[in-house]
Amino acid sequence: ELPQESVELLDEMVREGAEGLSICALNDPSICRRVEELADAGIPCVTFNSDLPKSRRLCFVGQDLYRAGRMAGELMSRCVRPGGLVLATVGNRRFDGHCQRLNGFLARMAERGFPAEQILTAETFNDYQTTYRAVAETLERHPDLAGIYLANLHVSGCVEAVRAAGRQGQLRVICHDINESVRRLLLEGSVDFTIPQDFRQQGYLPPFLLRDALRRGQLPPASRQDGQMSILCAENV
């Protein structure tokens, strides 16, 4: 997750003959500049999963993450009593996708009557121990915490901290994406809801969009976002 490493990887792929690139990277000025330089050189880039919105990327393939964050805010606002304190964790604020989720969540919570002072935020850098520590320290300082929103990885780190504090089943946990770990946590009741996204499309589409741009001159729309969003719980996972 170091910008210079991403730039070096882009340069390496170009040296190896890549004519187009699909990218998921930090929204960092140095990476955006390199994408612009590649565009000037006739090498298009498609972003997926997390966007570089201010770059000259050809297209973004992924979920409408701001809307997904708003959906999470809607769910949380209906699960937590008015006045309840909520923790919102984000993996890395330099990833546009994480920021979009968090901003959408905060916006909808505010609309539903939860002011900013009721929402605590923590950055976990997608690290298990950092997630565990952020949740554990928040629960220690605020034993009345009513809900946790996770816009990051390592949901299991959050759940373990809740268990260690003896709060399992006493607060609501809402996250994003689905894997075997999250599926198990949903079924056992440790996570209440998750909002998945179409990773298959995000991996499948970029090479074809690049091919069409390079070989056929067909330029895609600026964004190819997932259509319908779904909400998973223990009953439909």
For each predicted feature, which ranges?
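Non-catalytic structural scaffold of enzyme domains
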Residues: 11-15, 83, 107-112, 181-187
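A conserved helix-loop-strand patch within extracytoplasmic ligand-binding domains
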Residues: 68-86
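Hinge/cleft segment of the Venus flytrap/periplasmic-binding protein
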Residues: 109-112, 198-237
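Structural detector of well-ordered beta-strand residues that form the stable sheet scaffold
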Residues: 46, 87, 149, 172-174, ...
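Local beta-strand N-terminus motif with an aromatic residue
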Residues: 18, 57, 144-145, 191
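Hydrophobic alpha-helical
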Residues: 6-9, 13, 19-39, 105, ...
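Hinge/beta->alpha junction and helix N-cap segments in small-molecule ligand-binding domains
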Residues: 1-6, 27, 50, 61-71, ...
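Flexible loop/hinge segments that line or gate small-molecule binding clefts
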Residues: 30-67, 179-188
